[in-house]
Amino acid sequence: MATGVLPVFAGRATKACDILPDHDKIYEAEFQLGLTSDTQDIYGKITEHREVGNITAENIENTLEKFRGDIMQIPPMYSAVMINGQRLYDLARQGVVVEREARPITVYTLELTAYDEKTHFGKLEISCSRGTYIRTLINDIGDALGCGAIMTKLVRTKACGFTLDDCVALEDLQELANAGISAEKYLYPIEKVFGDLKAIKLNPHQEHLYRNGIRLDID
């Protein structure tokens, strides 16, 4: 199960959800070679045990090169993707597997940060576009290595411009609430999400239109 950065919008800030900048995301992912599962991670049913052999860190590094940049990825069956009005995960739970079209994604960085050649356990740091399934990326890397692989842990370290240093654990918020202490210091202004964008000055007419939800075509 993924942990890490998850921005939560409250009050009037929720109005910005539909116009959020298309920020890229950064993940730290752990994997295990030699296994495959129906969900492509450790939480699913193990479907196959494979011989790993003498796969080295160098072998993995060479394979990762094929998965950097603009690539096509087939979404997993256990996902919220809709096909013919049905969620894939609903079909998967019924034991139904359907054809899925590959989708374009971008993997900006893909680095092997740790690998144990005895246990075949490793870690990756990944910066990617929205819509990228990390467990599928790991599954495909395992297939390319010829031994299979599953994701064992996933931490989102950056999303919507926020990092782990900006975050507070849900358990800590609950403790504050139980103690009657305000959590206001953990609230950020919505402007933080748009901080990387260039400012555009609107005239009064344009401002009126924008405040009423009308999209503006500004060159």
Question: Where are the regions a protein language model picked out?
Answer:
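Glycine/acidic-rich beta-strand-loop module
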Residues: M1-P21, D90
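Accessory RNA 3′-end/elbow-binding domains used by RNA modification enzymes
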Residues: T3-V5, H23, E58-T63, F121, ...
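The conserved catalytic core of RNA pseudouridine synthases
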Residues: P7, V97-G131, R135-G146
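Residue-level signal for inorganic ion chemistry
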Residues: V8, A29, G85, L137, ...
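Acidic, low-complexity central loop/insert segments
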Residues: A13, I19-M72
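Structural signature of FAD isoalloxazine-binding scaffolds in flavoprotein oxidoreductases
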Residues: D18-L33, V98-L112
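Extended alpha-helical targeting/anchoring segments
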Residues: Y78-S79, I83-Y108
